[in-house]
Amino acid sequence: MATHLVLYNGAKMPILGLGTWKSPPGQVTEAVKTAIDLGYRHIDCAHVYQNENEVGVALQEKLKEQVVKREELFIVSKLWCTSHDKSLVKGACQKTLNDLKLDYLDLYLIHWPTGFKHGSEYFPLDAAGNVIPSDTDFLDTWEAMEGLVDEGLVKSIGVSNFNHLQIERILNKPGLKYKPAVNQIECHPYLTQEKLIQYCHSKGIVVTAYSPLGSPDRPWAKPEDPSLLEDPRIKAIADKHKKTTAQVLIRFPMQRNLVVIPKSVTPARIAENFQVFDFELSSEDMTTLLSYNRNWRVCALVSCASHKDYPFHAEF
Protein backbone atom coordinates (compact mmCIF):
# COMPACT_ATOMS: atom_id res chain seq x y z
CA MET A 1 0.00 0.00 0.00
CA ALA A 2 1.44 3.36 -1.04
CA THR A 3 1.90 5.79 1.85
CA HIS A 4 1.35 8.82 -0.43
CA LEU A 5 -0.75 9.84 -3.43
CA VAL A 6 0.77 12.19 -5.99
CA LEU A 7 -1.16 15.34 -6.89
CA TYR A 8 -1.23 16.46 -10.53
CA ASN A 9 1.45 19.06 -9.79
CA GLY A 10 3.83 16.42 -8.43
CA ALA A 11 3.25 17.13 -4.72
CA LYS A 12 3.11 14.02 -2.52
CA MET A 13 0.16 13.85 -0.16
CA PRO A 14 0.21 11.31 2.72
CA ILE A 15 -2.70 8.89 2.25
CA LEU A 16 -3.55 8.99 5.98
CA GLY A 17 -3.99 12.19 7.96
CA LEU A 18 -5.33 13.37 11.30
CA GLY A 19 -8.69 15.12 11.17
CA THR A 20 -9.32 18.01 13.60
CA TRP A 21 -13.02 18.86 13.11
CA LYS A 22 -14.69 18.85 16.58
CA SER A 23 -11.34 18.42 18.36
CA PRO A 24 -11.67 20.65 21.45
CA PRO A 25 -9.03 23.40 21.63
CA GLY A 26 -7.93 22.09 25.04
CA GLN A 27 -7.21 18.63 23.62
CA VAL A 28 -6.11 19.20 20.04
CA THR A 29 -2.55 20.34 20.86
CA GLU A 30 -1.78 17.04 22.60
CA ALA A 31 -3.60 15.09 19.88
CA VAL A 32 -1.47 16.61 17.11
CA LYS A 33 1.76 16.14 19.09
CA THR A 34 0.86 12.49 19.73
CA ALA A 35 0.01 11.98 16.06
CA ILE A 36 3.31 13.43 14.85
CA ASP A 37 5.23 11.30 17.36
CA LEU A 38 3.39 8.22 16.02
CA GLY A 39 4.29 8.99 12.42
CA TYR A 40 1.37 11.04 11.10
CA ARG A 41 2.64 13.70 8.68
CA HIS A 42 -0.67 15.02 7.28
CA ILE A 43 -2.89 17.22 9.47
CA ASP A 44 -6.29 18.39 8.17
CA CYS A 45 -7.42 21.75 9.55
CA ALA A 46 -9.93 24.52 8.84
CA HIS A 47 -10.55 28.04 10.08
CA VAL A 48 -14.16 27.19 10.98
CA TYR A 49 -12.99 24.43 13.39
CA GLN A 50 -11.87 27.29 15.69
CA ASN A 51 -8.81 25.39 16.89
CA GLU A 52 -6.09 26.25 14.36
CA ASN A 53 -4.15 28.27 16.93
CA GLU A 54 -3.91 25.20 19.18
CA VAL A 55 -2.95 22.97 16.24
CA GLY A 56 -0.24 25.53 15.48
CA VAL A 57 1.17 25.27 19.00
CA ALA A 58 1.67 21.53 18.46
CA LEU A 59 3.24 21.98 15.01
CA GLN A 60 5.59 24.66 16.35
CA GLU A 61 6.67 22.46 19.25
CA LYS A 62 7.40 19.42 17.07
CA LEU A 63 9.29 21.53 14.53
CA LYS A 64 11.31 23.14 17.32
CA GLU A 65 12.12 19.73 18.85
CA GLN A 66 13.22 18.66 15.34
CA VAL A 67 10.93 15.62 15.51
CA VAL A 68 9.95 16.63 11.95
CA LYS A 69 11.05 19.12 9.34
CA ARG A 70 8.47 21.44 7.79
CA GLU A 71 8.91 19.85 4.37
CA GLU A 72 7.99 16.44 5.84
CA LEU A 73 4.60 17.73 7.00
CA PHE A 74 1.53 18.10 4.78
CA ILE A 75 -0.75 20.72 6.30
CA VAL A 76 -4.22 21.32 4.87
CA SER A 77 -6.66 24.12 5.69
CA LYS A 78 -9.86 25.51 4.22
CA LEU A 79 -11.34 28.87 3.27
CA TRP A 80 -14.62 29.44 5.14
CA CYS A 81 -17.84 30.41 3.34
CA THR A 82 -17.91 33.96 4.72
CA SER A 83 -14.64 34.80 2.92
CA HIS A 84 -15.54 33.87 -0.67
CA ASP A 85 -15.32 37.46 -1.87
CA LYS A 86 -12.14 37.78 -3.96
CA SER A 87 -10.89 40.62 -1.77
CA LEU A 88 -11.16 38.49 1.41
CA VAL A 89 -9.40 35.29 0.35
CA LYS A 90 -5.81 36.34 0.99
CA GLY A 91 -6.61 37.75 4.43
CA ALA A 92 -8.42 34.54 5.39
CA CYS A 93 -5.44 32.46 4.28
CA GLN A 94 -3.04 34.72 6.18
CA LYS A 95 -5.19 34.39 9.33
CA THR A 96 -4.93 30.60 9.07
CA LEU A 97 -1.16 30.75 8.45
CA ASN A 98 -0.81 33.06 11.43
CA ASP A 99 -2.84 30.73 13.67
CA LEU A 100 -0.97 27.62 12.48
CA LYS A 101 2.34 29.53 12.80
CA LEU A 102 3.41 28.50 9.30
CA ASP A 103 4.63 30.45 6.30
CA TYR A 104 2.87 28.23 3.75
CA LEU A 105 0.15 25.58 3.50
CA ASP A 106 0.59 22.41 1.49
CA LEU A 107 -3.06 22.47 0.44
CA TYR A 108 -5.79 25.09 0.76
CA LEU A 109 -9.38 24.17 -0.08
CA ILE A 110 -12.59 26.10 -0.67
CA HIS A 111 -14.47 24.46 2.23
CA TRP A 112 -17.93 24.57 0.59
CA PRO A 113 -19.11 25.93 -2.79
CA THR A 114 -21.64 28.14 -0.96
CA GLY A 115 -20.67 31.73 -0.18
CA PHE A 116 -22.16 33.31 2.97
CA LYS A 117 -22.57 36.96 3.96
CA HIS A 118 -19.28 38.28 5.34
CA GLY A 119 -19.23 39.15 9.03
CA SER A 120 -18.40 37.82 12.47
CA GLU A 121 -20.80 34.85 12.33
CA TYR A 122 -19.77 31.61 10.64
CA PHE A 123 -23.42 30.85 9.77
CA PRO A 124 -25.27 34.17 9.31
CA LEU A 125 -28.99 33.32 9.46
CA ASP A 126 -32.11 35.24 8.49
CA ALA A 127 -35.29 35.31 10.62
CA ALA A 128 -36.49 32.05 9.04
CA GLY A 129 -33.27 30.27 10.00
CA ASN A 130 -31.84 30.10 6.48
CA VAL A 131 -28.24 30.99 5.82
CA ILE A 132 -27.72 34.44 4.25
CA PRO A 133 -25.78 33.99 1.01
CA SER A 134 -23.12 36.32 -0.37
CA ASP A 135 -23.40 37.57 -3.94
CA THR A 136 -20.19 35.77 -4.89
CA ASP A 137 -19.37 33.20 -7.56
CA PHE A 138 -16.91 30.45 -6.65
CA LEU A 139 -15.18 30.96 -10.02
CA ASP A 140 -14.05 34.36 -8.75
CA THR A 141 -13.08 32.80 -5.42
CA TRP A 142 -11.02 30.27 -7.40
CA GLU A 143 -9.09 33.09 -9.12
CA ALA A 144 -8.12 34.45 -5.72
CA MET A 145 -7.07 30.92 -4.66
CA GLU A 146 -4.81 30.74 -7.72
CA GLY A 147 -3.23 34.01 -6.58
CA LEU A 148 -2.25 32.38 -3.27
CA VAL A 149 -0.21 29.79 -5.19
CA ASP A 150 1.53 32.51 -7.20
CA GLU A 151 2.35 34.39 -3.99
CA GLY A 152 3.83 31.27 -2.36
CA LEU A 153 1.31 31.16 0.49
CA VAL A 154 0.03 27.73 -0.57
CA LYS A 155 1.59 24.91 -2.61
CA SER A 156 -1.65 23.40 -3.95
CA ILE A 157 -5.31 24.39 -4.07
CA GLY A 158 -8.50 22.38 -4.20
CA VAL A 159 -12.14 22.17 -3.22
CA SER A 160 -14.33 20.41 -0.68
CA ASN A 161 -17.98 19.34 -0.88
CA PHE A 162 -18.20 20.27 -4.58
CA ASN A 163 -20.35 18.13 -6.88
CA HIS A 164 -19.08 17.14 -10.32
CA LEU A 165 -20.98 19.91 -12.11
CA GLN A 166 -19.33 22.50 -9.87
CA ILE A 167 -15.88 21.03 -10.50
CA GLU A 168 -16.66 20.99 -14.21
CA ARG A 169 -17.42 24.74 -14.01
CA ILE A 170 -13.93 25.35 -12.61
CA LEU A 171 -12.24 23.08 -15.17
CA ASN A 172 -14.05 24.90 -18.00
CA LYS A 173 -13.33 28.37 -16.64
CA PRO A 174 -11.76 30.63 -19.29
CA GLY A 175 -8.21 31.51 -18.27
CA LEU A 176 -7.99 28.75 -15.65
CA LYS A 177 -4.46 28.77 -14.24
CA TYR A 178 -4.46 25.82 -11.82
CA LYS A 179 -7.04 23.06 -11.69
CA PRO A 180 -8.22 21.74 -8.32
CA ALA A 181 -5.70 19.21 -7.02
CA VAL A 182 -8.11 17.66 -4.49
CA ASN A 183 -11.83 17.36 -3.74
CA GLN A 184 -12.41 16.54 -0.07
CA ILE A 185 -15.79 14.86 0.42
CA GLU A 186 -17.68 12.83 2.98
CA CYS A 187 -17.18 9.14 2.18
CA HIS A 188 -17.78 5.87 4.04
CA PRO A 189 -19.73 2.61 3.42
CA TYR A 190 -23.10 4.38 3.86
CA LEU A 191 -22.08 7.11 1.36
CA THR A 192 -19.74 5.46 -1.13
CA GLN A 193 -19.66 8.31 -3.68
CA GLU A 194 -18.76 5.98 -6.57
CA LYS A 195 -19.79 8.32 -9.39
CA LEU A 196 -18.16 11.43 -7.95
CA ILE A 197 -14.92 9.58 -7.19
CA GLN A 198 -14.82 8.10 -10.68
CA TYR A 199 -15.36 11.57 -12.13
CA CYS A 200 -12.60 13.17 -10.01
CA HIS A 201 -10.11 10.41 -10.76
CA SER A 202 -10.87 10.73 -14.49
CA LYS A 203 -9.84 14.41 -14.23
CA GLY A 204 -6.65 13.73 -12.27
CA ILE A 205 -8.16 15.08 -9.05
CA VAL A 206 -7.25 13.28 -5.82
CA VAL A 207 -10.17 12.61 -3.46
CA THR A 208 -9.92 12.88 0.32
CA ALA A 209 -12.55 11.03 2.38
CA TYR A 210 -13.75 12.84 5.49
CA SER A 211 -15.89 11.35 8.28
CA PRO A 212 -14.69 7.82 7.36
CA LEU A 213 -16.06 6.51 10.68
CA GLY A 214 -19.41 8.26 10.20
CA SER A 215 -18.53 11.07 12.62
CA PRO A 216 -20.01 9.44 15.75
CA ASP A 217 -19.33 12.65 17.73
CA ARG A 218 -21.31 14.94 15.40
CA PRO A 219 -23.36 17.39 17.47
CA TRP A 220 -26.62 16.70 15.57
CA ALA A 221 -26.61 12.88 15.91
CA LYS A 222 -30.02 11.28 16.48
CA PRO A 223 -30.49 7.95 18.28
CA GLU A 224 -32.12 6.36 15.21
CA ASP A 225 -29.19 7.26 12.90
CA PRO A 226 -27.21 4.33 11.49
CA SER A 227 -23.82 3.66 13.13
CA LEU A 228 -20.90 2.40 11.07
CA LEU A 229 -18.81 1.60 14.15
CA GLU A 230 -21.63 -0.58 15.53
CA ASP A 231 -22.57 -2.28 12.26
CA PRO A 232 -22.22 -6.04 12.91
CA ARG A 233 -21.55 -6.71 9.21
CA ILE A 234 -18.49 -4.47 9.30
CA LYS A 235 -17.45 -5.88 12.68
CA ALA A 236 -17.47 -9.36 11.11
CA ILE A 237 -15.01 -8.23 8.42
CA ALA A 238 -12.83 -6.66 11.12
CA ASP A 239 -12.85 -9.84 13.22
CA LYS A 240 -11.76 -11.88 10.22
CA HIS A 241 -8.68 -9.66 9.84
CA LYS A 242 -8.11 -9.40 13.62
CA LYS A 243 -8.60 -5.65 13.32
CA THR A 244 -11.08 -3.15 14.76
CA THR A 245 -14.11 -1.82 12.90
CA ALA A 246 -12.44 1.62 12.82
CA GLN A 247 -9.34 0.13 11.19
CA VAL A 248 -11.46 -1.51 8.48
CA LEU A 249 -13.31 1.78 7.90
CA ILE A 250 -9.96 3.57 7.47
CA ARG A 251 -8.41 0.89 5.28
CA PHE A 252 -11.48 0.79 2.99
CA PRO A 253 -10.97 4.24 1.39
CA MET A 254 -7.20 3.72 1.19
CA GLN A 255 -7.77 0.71 -1.07
CA ARG A 256 -9.98 2.90 -3.27
CA ASN A 257 -7.01 5.25 -3.78
CA LEU A 258 -8.51 7.88 -1.51
CA VAL A 259 -6.75 9.95 1.13
CA VAL A 260 -8.46 9.48 4.51
CA ILE A 261 -8.50 11.74 7.60
CA PRO A 262 -10.00 10.07 10.71
CA LYS A 263 -10.33 12.42 13.69
CA SER A 264 -9.47 11.51 17.25
CA VAL A 265 -8.11 13.26 20.35
CA THR A 266 -7.61 9.97 22.24
CA PRO A 267 -3.95 8.84 22.11
CA ALA A 268 -4.82 5.12 21.98
CA ARG A 269 -7.22 5.68 19.08
CA ILE A 270 -4.85 8.01 17.24
CA ALA A 271 -2.38 5.10 17.39
CA GLU A 272 -5.00 2.47 16.45
CA ASN A 273 -6.13 4.52 13.45
CA PHE A 274 -2.56 4.52 12.09
CA GLN A 275 -2.19 0.70 12.29
CA VAL A 276 -3.77 0.14 8.89
CA PHE A 277 -0.76 -0.55 6.66
CA ASP A 278 -0.27 -4.18 7.75
CA PHE A 279 -3.42 -5.84 6.38
CA GLU A 280 -5.44 -5.90 3.19
CA LEU A 281 -9.16 -6.13 2.55
CA SER A 282 -10.01 -8.70 -0.13
CA SER A 283 -11.83 -7.66 -3.29
CA GLU A 284 -14.82 -9.47 -1.81
CA ASP A 285 -14.57 -7.38 1.39
CA MET A 286 -14.39 -4.24 -0.75
CA THR A 287 -17.44 -5.18 -2.83
CA THR A 288 -19.36 -6.04 0.34
CA LEU A 289 -18.51 -2.70 1.99
CA LEU A 290 -19.49 -0.80 -1.17
CA SER A 291 -22.85 -2.62 -1.17
CA TYR A 292 -23.77 -0.96 2.16
CA ASN A 293 -24.27 2.41 0.44
CA ARG A 294 -27.52 4.14 1.47
CA ASN A 295 -26.65 7.72 0.47
CA TRP A 296 -26.63 8.70 4.15
CA ARG A 297 -24.83 11.96 4.92
CA VAL A 298 -23.39 13.20 8.19
CA CYS A 299 -22.76 16.65 6.66
CA ALA A 300 -25.76 17.67 4.57
CA LEU A 301 -25.55 21.40 5.44
CA VAL A 302 -29.35 21.55 5.48
CA SER A 303 -29.42 25.23 6.50
CA CYS A 304 -28.05 25.97 3.00
CA ALA A 305 -30.42 23.81 0.96
CA SER A 306 -31.90 26.86 -0.78
CA HIS A 307 -28.48 28.38 -1.61
CA LYS A 308 -27.82 28.67 -5.37
CA ASP A 309 -24.59 26.68 -4.94
CA TYR A 310 -25.90 24.00 -2.55
CA PRO A 311 -23.99 20.92 -3.75
CA PHE A 312 -26.26 18.01 -2.84
CA HIS A 313 -29.30 18.51 -5.09
CA ALA A 314 -27.33 17.04 -8.02
CA GLU A 315 -27.07 13.26 -8.26
CA PHE A 316 -23.28 13.51 -7.82
UniProtKB/Swiss-Prot annotation:
Protein EC: 1.1.1.21, 1.1.1.300, 1.1.1.372, 1.1.1.54
Quaternary data: Monomer.
Residue numbers marked as site, Lowers pKa of active site Tyr: K78
Pfam entry (one): Aldo_ket_red
Protein's UniProt name: Aldo-keto reductase family 1 member B1
Species assigned in the record: Oryctolagus cuniculus
Any GO molecular function: allyl-alcohol dehydrogenase activity
Protein residues bound to NADP(+): 10-19, 211-273
Catalyses which reaction(s): an alditol + NADP(+) = an aldose + NADPH + H(+); all-trans-retinol + NADP(+) = all-trans-retinal + NADPH + H(+); 9-cis-retinol + NADP(+) = 9-cis-retinal + NADPH + H(+); 13-cis-retinol + NADP(+) = 13-cis-retinal + NADPH + H(+)
Binding residues annotated for substrate, in chain numbering: H111
UniProt cross-references to InterPro entries, sorted A to Z: AKR, Aldo/ket_reductase_CS, NADP_OxRdtase_dom, NADP_OxRdtase_dom_sf
Active site: Y49 (proton donor)
Main subcellular localisation: cytoplasm
GO cellular component: cytoplasm
Domain of life assignment: Eukaryota
